[in-house]
Protein backbone atom coordinates (compact mmCIF):
# COMPACT_ATOMS: atom_id res chain seq x y z
CA UNK A 1 0.00 0.00 0.00
CA UNK A 2 1.27 3.45 -0.89
CA UNK A 3 2.03 6.02 1.78
CA UNK A 4 -0.05 8.48 -0.24
CA UNK A 5 -3.84 8.62 0.00
CA UNK A 6 -4.34 11.15 -2.81
CA UNK A 7 -2.51 11.52 -6.09
CA UNK A 8 -2.73 13.91 -9.02
CA UNK A 9 -2.28 12.43 -12.48
CA UNK A 10 -1.50 14.79 -15.37
CA UNK A 11 -2.22 13.30 -18.77
CA UNK A 12 -1.33 14.87 -22.08
CA UNK A 13 -4.29 14.96 -24.43
CA UNK A 14 -1.99 13.69 -27.14
CA UNK A 15 -1.40 10.52 -25.11
CA UNK A 16 -5.09 9.62 -25.58
CA UNK A 17 -4.53 9.63 -29.32
CA UNK A 18 -2.29 6.59 -29.19
CA UNK A 19 0.72 6.43 -31.52
CA UNK A 20 -0.79 9.04 -33.86
CA UNK A 21 -1.44 11.51 -31.02
CA UNK A 22 -4.72 12.58 -32.65
CA UNK A 23 -8.32 11.94 -31.71
CA UNK A 24 -9.14 9.40 -29.01
CA UNK A 25 -7.78 5.87 -29.28
CA UNK A 26 -10.21 3.63 -27.37
CA UNK A 27 -7.46 1.15 -26.45
CA UNK A 28 -5.36 3.85 -24.78
CA UNK A 29 -8.44 5.30 -23.08
CA UNK A 30 -9.36 1.87 -21.67
CA UNK A 31 -5.77 1.23 -20.55
CA UNK A 32 -5.63 4.51 -18.61
CA UNK A 33 -9.06 3.82 -17.11
CA UNK A 34 -8.00 0.36 -15.92
CA UNK A 35 -4.86 1.77 -14.28
CA UNK A 36 -6.87 4.49 -12.52
CA UNK A 37 -9.56 2.00 -11.45
CA UNK A 38 -6.92 -0.32 -9.98
CA UNK A 39 -5.39 2.54 -7.99
CA UNK A 40 -8.81 3.57 -6.66
CA UNK A 41 -9.71 -0.01 -5.75
CA UNK A 42 -6.43 -0.13 -3.79
CA UNK A 43 -7.53 2.84 -1.68
CA UNK A 44 -6.10 5.85 -3.53
CA UNK A 45 -8.06 8.97 -4.34
CA UNK A 46 -7.08 10.03 -7.85
CA UNK A 47 -7.51 13.49 -9.37
CA UNK A 48 -6.77 13.78 -13.08
CA UNK A 49 -5.84 16.84 -15.10
CA UNK A 50 -5.96 16.19 -18.83
CA UNK A 51 -5.06 18.29 -21.84
CA UNK A 52 -6.80 18.61 -25.18
CA UNK A 53 -3.88 18.72 -27.60
CA UNK A 54 -5.02 15.58 -29.39
CA UNK A 55 -8.05 17.52 -30.62
CA UNK A 56 -7.03 21.18 -30.78
CA UNK A 57 -4.24 23.47 -29.58
CA UNK A 58 -5.02 27.14 -29.20
CA UNK A 59 -1.67 28.25 -30.61
CA UNK A 60 -2.18 26.17 -33.75
CA UNK A 61 -5.40 28.05 -34.38
CA UNK A 62 -3.58 31.38 -34.45
CA UNK A 63 -1.63 30.25 -37.50
CA UNK A 64 -4.90 29.32 -39.19
CA UNK A 65 -6.65 32.63 -38.72
CA UNK A 66 -8.17 32.16 -35.25
CA UNK A 67 -7.59 34.87 -32.71
CA UNK A 68 -5.71 33.59 -29.65
CA UNK A 69 -8.61 33.88 -27.20
CA UNK A 70 -11.04 31.87 -29.34
CA UNK A 71 -8.32 29.36 -30.15
CA UNK A 72 -7.74 28.84 -26.44
CA UNK A 73 -11.50 28.41 -25.92
CA UNK A 74 -11.51 25.62 -28.51
CA UNK A 75 -8.59 24.02 -26.68
CA UNK A 76 -10.50 24.19 -23.38
CA UNK A 77 -13.48 22.48 -25.00
CA UNK A 78 -11.14 19.78 -26.29
CA UNK A 79 -10.01 19.25 -22.70
CA UNK A 80 -13.62 18.75 -21.61
CA UNK A 81 -14.20 16.25 -24.44
CA UNK A 82 -11.19 14.22 -23.27
CA UNK A 83 -12.34 14.46 -19.66
CA UNK A 84 -15.80 13.14 -20.51
CA UNK A 85 -14.32 10.26 -22.49
CA UNK A 86 -11.92 9.29 -19.73
CA UNK A 87 -14.65 9.56 -17.07
CA UNK A 88 -16.90 7.22 -19.09
CA UNK A 89 -14.05 4.72 -19.45
CA UNK A 90 -13.29 4.87 -15.72
CA UNK A 91 -16.96 4.26 -14.90
CA UNK A 92 -16.92 1.29 -17.29
CA UNK A 93 -13.97 -0.05 -15.28
CA UNK A 94 -16.20 -0.04 -12.19
CA UNK A 95 -15.14 3.16 -10.43
CA UNK A 96 -17.02 6.41 -9.87
CA UNK A 97 -15.76 9.41 -11.84
CA UNK A 98 -16.79 13.06 -11.96
CA UNK A 99 -15.83 15.81 -14.41
CA UNK A 100 -15.36 19.34 -13.07
CA UNK A 101 -14.82 22.48 -15.15
CA UNK A 102 -13.84 26.02 -14.21
CA UNK A 103 -16.41 27.31 -16.70
CA UNK A 104 -20.08 26.48 -16.03
CA UNK A 105 -21.17 23.82 -18.55
CA UNK A 106 -24.23 22.21 -17.01
CA UNK A 107 -25.36 19.55 -17.84
CA UNK A 108 -22.08 18.54 -19.52
CA UNK A 109 -19.91 18.73 -16.39
CA UNK A 110 -20.05 20.06 -12.85
CA UNK A 111 -18.83 23.57 -12.11
CA UNK A 112 -15.67 23.31 -10.02
CA UNK A 113 -16.08 24.33 -6.42
CA UNK A 114 -13.34 23.25 -4.05
CA UNK A 115 -15.67 21.85 -1.40
CA UNK A 116 -17.38 19.61 -3.96
CA UNK A 117 -14.13 18.35 -5.43
CA UNK A 118 -12.22 17.50 -2.23
What are these regions (language model features)?
Residues 1-47:
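N-terminal glycine-/serine-/threonine-rich phosphate-binding loop
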Residues 2-7, 52-57, 83-84:
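Short low-complexity stretches enriched in small and charged residues
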Residues 9, 47-51, 97-102:
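General beta-strand structural signal in soluble alpha/beta enzymes
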Residues 10, 18, 50, 68, ...:
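A generic, residue-level signal for flexible/boundary positions that often mark functional hotspots
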Residues 15-17, 53-58, 106-107:
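Short, active-site-adjacent cap segments at secondary-structure transitions
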Residues 38-40, 45-46, 52-59, 74-77:
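N-terminal active-site beta-alpha-beta segment that forms phosphate/nucleotide-binding
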Residues 61-118:
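Ligand-binding beta-strand-loop-alpha-helix segment within the catalytic cores
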Amino acid sequence: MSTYRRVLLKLSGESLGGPAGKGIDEKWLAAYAEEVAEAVKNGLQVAIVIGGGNIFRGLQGVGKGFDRVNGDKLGMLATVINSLGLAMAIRSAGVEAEVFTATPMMPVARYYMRDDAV
